Amino acid sequence: MGAMDVQLESTAVQHGQAKINVEEHALVSLLSDEKYATEKTEDVDPDDYEKLEEGIMQYGCAHYRRRCRIRAPCCNEIFDCRHCHNETKNSIKIDAVKRHELPRHEVQQVICSLCGTEQEVRQVCISCGVCMGKYFCEVCKLFDDDVSKQQYHCNGCGICRIGGKENFFHCSKCGCCYSIVLKNSHACVEGAMHHDCPICFEYLFESTNDVSVLPCGHTIHVKCLREMEEHCQFACPLCSKSVCDMSKAWERLDEELATISDTCDNKMVRILCNDCGATSEVQFHLIAHKCQKCKSYNTRQI
């Protein structure tokens, strides 16, 4: 199946195996974005700058590098971040009745990791003056010192994303951000990301794993698409359309079927093509049936 592997890889790039890592990230950088420079002066004193930078990349958790912790509005407990809360409070080890997730936009209080002062959500600690997150989103209540992620806030999605705003666009019909390479080529599916992955059932819109947009417009985790490939599954789990260019595979199947004698010359069946939607009446074959319109073997009897 080497040829199919190459085809799937090529299609994944063409159809936006863009990183749609949809976790909330930065709207504002106090230290670099002049548009939001309400808390800095024209000439920053070297001592003040040194204070802002104190402890950068030294605090945080497995999910974020940040210099604060959050108080969860739902259970009033303190966690390093929203994910840390959800991993603890939404675990299978917790009573199902008590499981819950933290509503990111409702966080009101943060605790400075350097001085321990609890305060309302803000970028600079009111007590010690340290910047608690080089990138800060007041809407998503997100703090992150790792600016290499190229965080940006999408008003359409209502959350922040990573990868650089210039590399993505928001599709109003699909209801999510896609790679700019898909702007004029993707198939729109209403609410394409607002559902669970058809393989692992994780909610795609808030998933921290990479998501791929299939030619049919449906979405799936990249890792799940790879697992499908490993098991020789090349049809969308939702609509059954081919997930990549299968023309070479169909040509090979033509050659193989030509060597197999057919003992049902007089039997005809009607088929529906999963790729183009056309119906055909073709000679019955034990192995596969070919669409008379698009020549695909991705068909079913009707």
From Swiss-Prot:
Its annotated pathway reads: Protein modification; protein ubiquitination
Q: Which residues bind Zn(2+) 6?
A: 171, 174, 186, 188
GO terms, molecular function? ubiquitin protein ligase activity; zinc ion binding
Expression induction: Induced by salicylic acid (SA), ethylene and infection with the rice blast fungal pathogen Magnaporthe oryzae. Induced by abscisic acid (ABA) and heat shock in leaves.
Keyword flag Metal-binding: yes
Please cite one Gene Ontology biological process associated with this protein.
ubiquitin-dependent protein catabolic process
**Which residues belong to zinc fingers classed as CTCHY-type?**
132-196
What positions does the entry give for Zn(2+) 3 binding?
112, 115, 125, 128
Q: Does the record carry Zinc-finger as a key word?
A: yes
Residues noted as binding Zn(2+) 5 in the record, renumbered to the chain: 154, 157, 170, 177
Zn finger (RING-type) location? 197-240
Q: Which UniProt keywords apply?
A: Metal-binding, Nucleus, Stress response, Transferase, Ubl conjugation pathway, Zinc, Zinc-finger
Q: Which GO terms describe its cellular component?
A: nucleus
The residues that the entry says bind Zn(2+) 1 are 61, 63, 81, 84
The protein's location, in the record's own words, is: Nucleus
Enzyme Commission code: 2.3.2.27
What residues does Zn(2+) 2 bind to? 74-75, 85, 100
Reported consequences of knocking out the gene: Decreased relative stomata aperture under normal growth conditions.
Q: Which Gene3D superfamilies match?
A: 2.20.28.10, Zinc/RING finger domain, C3HC4 (zinc finger)
Q: Which reaction does it catalyse?
A: S-ubiquitinyl-[E2 ubiquitin-conjugating enzyme]-L-cysteine + [acceptor protein]-L-lysine = [E2 ubiquitin-conjugating enzyme]-L-cysteine + N(6)-ubiquitinyl-[acceptor protein]-L-lysine
Q: Which SMART domains match?
A: RING
Query: Which residues does the annotation say bind Zn(2+) 4?
Result: 137, 140, 153, 160
The signal peptide, as residue positions, is none
Q: Which InterPro entries match?
A: RCHY1_zinc-ribbon, Znf_CHY, Znf_CHY_sf, Znf_CTCHY, Znf_CTCHY_sf, Znf_RING, Znf_RING/FYVE/PHD
Protein role: Possesses transactivation activity in yeast cells. Involved in the regulation of stomatal aperture. May modulate the expression of genes that control stomata opening during heat shock or drought stress.
- What protein does this entry describe? Probable E3 ubiquitin-protein ligase RZFP34
Whose protein is this, by species? Oryza sativa subsp. japonica
